[in-house]
């Protein structure tokens, strides 16, 4: 028992001393800090505090250049400026949002790719309400009629009437062509229709009186409006010479 009491007295005595010393040192340090704060701190007047700006002034020269972070975007981009703060400075980084594209309607898909509209008919039949399905079917029928229908063809028209109509159109075209050809072969003075344009030209020389074809025999000054007549006249000269030789 005596030994245990002595050990307890020995262990407790230094702890008490150390705690008293620590308390005294802490009191001295707190007094010194309060004295220094009273000496060094100078509070400004209330008027200057009331008129001072709320936000602190930031030195622009100390700030680094603004860093812009751009997110990957699709065709439609919207800018959403966000302030991001760092330990050293404030960086303004406009982040570009990437909204999800809206699904194309049936008309837009059909105008872009008609094959896609036929392939996705089963999907649209399940995901579209009945009223919209009716509108889509009507639009699909209209587009198919525009692409594959013949011009000037009415629904319910008899094919025989169509053939007769086309035949009459062809007959009218042929008549017009004949009239044009007839005008090319018809004399504008007497109205005679020639078989060929060349004969029309020779016939026209009769009305004008021109004789462009002259005889090539020496000392013969005859001229003709038709080349065949000139050649016939030239043969007469040759026959006369042949008769003289035989005599």
From Swiss-Prot:
InterPro entries per record: Znf_C2H2_sf, Znf_C2H2_type
Keywords: Metal-binding, Repeat, Zinc, Zinc-finger
Gene3D superfamilies attached to this UniProt entry: Classic Zinc Finger (3.30.160.60)
Matches recorded under Pfam families: zf-C2H2 (PF00096)
GO biological process, any: DNA damage checkpoint signaling
PROSITE patterns: ZINC_FINGER_C2H2_1 (PS00028), ZINC_FINGER_C2H2_2 (PS50157)
Cysteine disulfide links: none
Full protein name: Zinc finger protein YPR015C
Organism name: Saccharomyces cerevisiae (strain ATCC 204508 / S288c) (Baker's yeast)
Classification lineage: Eukaryota, Fungi, Dikarya, Ascomycota, Saccharomycotina
């Amino acid at each position: 028992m005596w030994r245990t009491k002595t050990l307890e007295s020995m262990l407790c005595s230094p702890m008490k001393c150390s705690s008293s010393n620590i308390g005294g040192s802490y009191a001295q340090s707190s007094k010194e800090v309060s004295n220094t704060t009273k000496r060094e701190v100078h509070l400004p007047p209330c008027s200057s505090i009331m008129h001072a700006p709320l936000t602190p002034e930031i030195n622009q020269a100390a700030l680094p250049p603004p860093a812009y972070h751009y997110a990957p975007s699709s065709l439609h981009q919207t800018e959403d400026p966000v302030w991001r703060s760092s330990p050293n400075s404030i960086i303004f980084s406009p982040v570009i949002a990437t909204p999800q594209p809206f699904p194309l309607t049936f008309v837009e898909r059909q105008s872009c790719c008609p094959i896609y509209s036929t392939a996705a008919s089963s999907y649209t039949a399940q995901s579209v309400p009945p009223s919209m399905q009716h509108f889509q079917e009507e639009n699909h029928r209209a587009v198919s009629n525009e692409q594959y229908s013949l011009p000037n063809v009415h629904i319910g028209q008899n094919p025989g009437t169509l053939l007769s109509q086309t035949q009459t159109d062809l007959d009218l075209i042929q008549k017009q062509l004949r009239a044009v050809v007839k005008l090319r072969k018809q004399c504008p003075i007497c109205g005679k229709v020639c078989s060929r344009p060349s004969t029309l030209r020779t016939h026209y020389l009769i009305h004008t009186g021109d004789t462009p074809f002259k005889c090539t025999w020496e000392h013969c000054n005859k001229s003709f409006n038709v080349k065949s007549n000139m050649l016939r006249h030239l043969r007469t000269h040759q026959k006369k010479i042949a008769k003289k030789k035989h005599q």
